[in-house]
Regions:
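Periplasmic/cell-envelope proteins involved in peptidoglycan metabolism and beta-lactam response
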Residues: 1-305, 327, 349, 402-412, ...
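Beta-lactam-recognizing serine transpeptidase/beta-lactamase-like catalytic domain environment
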Residues: 2-6, 12, 74, 118, ...
Length: 681
């Protein structure tokens, strides 16, 4: 039996057990409270915030693109999209009809859209209608009680100052598709998001990571139905959660001169083709136009299927940049290369002559000259000036195709020149190895005769053609063409600058340079030249015309008038050269598709670019040209007073001849073209 002491001890043990249990329970409760409120307090607080806060992305405005003289070529315009966030869209039966009425959509189209995205996370917004009007924005914002879960997202759309005049050069932006997101994230190591816009061509694509900026975000306080109540400032939030300011993209200053660009664009009105002007002394692209074009702004405001279908089904391929992505037979503009190769290799000299009777026979096969009655006795100078085919057929029998390949590639043809723009093509300069690998056939001599006049397999881009003539003008210095001068911040700080880069340099014989340059001068400026129709008062060019066959004609059709042919079978017209003719500054290349003749079709476009350039940068030189219009090429060479003034828009020390013919050395220009230091001798 238990005694009284035993009974007391039992009660004490029970009390201690109960107390220990109570203490343990409190300890567990306190531990749990510590775990929830201290250890994971931040996490659970953030969960609670998600119920009353909405994180809105603040899109970073894209950087601006300027011309070389700081003319704004692109700008940003706000665009508004109506979106539904399913997490807060709790009254669809009531809201959808009202929303459809405001947005002028059918209720069924909204329901189908929501059904399409019902598998994605409910907090992700769904765009119901892009680019809504300001009236629609006002209704959705002021009557938000009627539209729970519906909000307005602001985007920045892109507009282009000159429309399609620079469409291929500047490019366009459009929304990244869901399929491309993973690939782009991997390629660029950048956290692209659904709804992001990205450059898809031209400068917009090539420099997208510079231009795009960095998005921020802003927290909004919302009610239980997802309606925005107020912006939340950083001081309102728990430690570790903060608003982020969007950082605008960097700005781009191009090498393009807008006036020369527009001159080329308007000169190509009603024509399909390409035009380019390059600074001979740096490789900077002054103008770059491809037609037909497209409206780049439409891509950033929500491209309609009809417009996209029109673009991709158009047989003229308006999306293709003909300057760098298309290649053409250069025709007679290539004869200059053949002449240089023959002179440099000693195959001919300045005294070599050919009697042109209008055709040349290789075995039993006739090769016709463009001039049916022939040119008579022709030397290398006249062969360029008057574009005699028979002269070059004769050279073709003496020249190995690999020699032609050597010089063409030396001048940058048949290869990518490395311009920093997407999808540059190589063109084609054939040789024996190429034909054997491609066709498993030996090279034939008759093929060389076609190649030396820029036909058959020979294909070049307008960019390569301009670079070739720039290299002639600089007497052997091939620059890498580029379209961007610098990248700079909104404060004006230059972050990157692009300097001239010489791909390679070589020296030509003086006799070669003298013959070729005089012939190119006389093509435009003296009677008998194939481009004398483009001689302009105060606008002095040197260059070469070309006609590129689209298809071969039979012997009885070869001399038929080109304009009488069906349009798609007409020859392309080309002009390539440089300006001014003496002490040149820019090289020019123009292709007019199915233009028939280089002089009448392409020549006026080149002349328009040369005129815009000389009028703007060398007004004094233009006056001298007008005064000295009767001078011959040798007289101009000897008259140093005709050396052009330096480009007034650039900085740097230069040497030039003043109006009195005195050599001025180390003339320093600032942006306002004021002399800082000058001396003469």
């Amino acid at each position: 039996m238990f005694g009284e002491d035993d009974l007391v001890r039992v009660h004490q043990d029970r009390s201690e057990l109960i107390l220990n249990i109570i203490v343990a329970c409190f300890a567990i409760l306190l531990a749990r409270l510590w775990y929830l409120q201290i250890y994971h307090g931040k996490m659970f607080f953030n969960y609670s915030l998600e119920n009353r806060l909405r994180k809105d992305v603040v899109r970073a405005p894209r950087g601006m693109i300027f011309s070389r003289n700081n003319v704004l070529l692109t700008h940003n315009v706000p665009r508004f999209d109506a979106v539904i966030t399913p997490q807060y869209f709790d009254s669809p039966d009531d809201t959808i009809p009202a929303l459809a009425e405001v947005l002028e959509l059918s209720p069924d189209s909204i329901r189908k859209l929501l059904k399409k995205f019902q598998g994605q996370a409910k907090y992700l917004p769904i765009v119901v209608k892009k680019n809504i009007s300001r009236r629609e924005v006002a209704i959705l914002e002021t009557e938000s009680n009627r539209f729970p879960g519906v909000s307005v997202d602001t985007f920045i759309s892109r507009e282009y100052t000159d429309g399609d005049a620079g469409a291929h050069l500047l490019g366009y932006i459009s929304e990244i598709s869901q399929e491309k997101l993973p690939k782009l994230r991997e390629r660029d190591k950048y956290d692209y998001k659904q709804g992001d816009f990205i450059g898809q061509s031209g400068v917009e694509q090539q420099y997208d990571l510079d231009i795009r900026g960095e998005d921020g975000y802003q927290f909004m306080e919302v009610d239980a139905r997802g309606r925005a109540r107020r912006h939340v400032t950083s001081g309102d939030l728990y430690t570790g959660i903060d608003n982020k300011i969007a950082n605008p993209g960097k700005n781009i200053r191009l090498t393009i001169d807008r006036d020369v660009q527009l001159a080329a664009y308007h000169a190509l009105d009603g024509k399909d083709g390409a035009a380019i002007a390059i600074d001979i002394e740096s490789g900077e692209v002054i103008a770059m136009v491809s037609r037909p074009g497209f409206d780049p702004a439409k891509f950033s405001t929500g491209l309609t299927s009809n417009y996209w279908g029109t673009l991709i089904m158009d047989e003229k391929h308006p999306l293709r940049d003909r300057v760098i992505q298309e290649h053409y037979s250069p025709g007679s503009t290539f004869k200059t290369l053949t002449a240089i190769a023959a002179l440099e290799e000693g195959i001919i000299d300045e005294n070599f002559k050919v009697n042109c009777t209008g055709k040349y026979h290789l075995g039993a096969r006739p090769f016709h000259c463009w001039k049916k009655e022939g040119h008579g006795a022709v030397d290398v100078y006249r062969s360029i000036k008057e574009s005699c085919d028979v002269f070059y057929y004769t050279i073709g029998t003496k020249m190995d195709i690999d020699i032609l390949y050597k010089y063409a590639t030396l001048f940058g043809m048949g290869q990518r020149l490395g311009i920093a723009l997407p999808r540059e093509t190589t063109g084609l300069i054939p040789n024996k190895d190429w034909k054997m690998k491609r066709m498993k056939q030996e090279w034939q001599k008759g093929e060389t005769l076609s190649c030396v006049i820029g036909q058959s397999f020979v294909n070049v881009t307008p960019l390569q053609l301009a670079s070739f003539y720039a290299t002639i003008a600089s007497e052997g210095k091939l620059y890498r063409p580029h379209v961007v001068k610098e990248v700079f911040s909104n404060t004006g700080e230059v972050l990157k600058s692009y300097k001239p880069e010489v791909i390679h340099q070589f020296k030509l014989k003086k006799t070669t340079v003298d013959i070729v340059k005089q012939a190119l001068f006389d093509v435009v400026n003296t009677p008998g030249g194939t481009a004398t129709s483009q001689k302009g008062v105060g606008i002095q060019m040197a260059g070469k015309t070309g006609t590129a066959q689209v298809m071969s004609f039979s012997a009885h059709n070869i001399f038929n008038k080109c304009e009488n042919q069906e349009y798609k079978y007409r020859h392309h017209g080309l002009f390539a050269g440089y300006a001014p003719a003496i002490n040149p500054k820019i090289a020019l290349a123009v292709v007019v598709e199915h233009g028939c003749h280089g002089s009448s079709a392409a020549g006026p476009v080149a002349k328009a670019m040369a005129a815009a350039f000389i009028n703007k940068y060398y007004p004094t030189y233009q006056k001298r040209l007008i005064a000295q219009d009767k001078m011959t090429y040798p007289q101009i060479i000897d008259d140093n007073r005709l050396n052009p003034d330096p480009m007034i828009m650039e900085k740097g020390e230069v040497n030039y001849y003043n109006d009195e013919g005195v050599l001025v050395k180390n003339f320093f220009l600032d942006k306002n073209a004021q002399a800082v230091n000058a001396g003469g001798e």
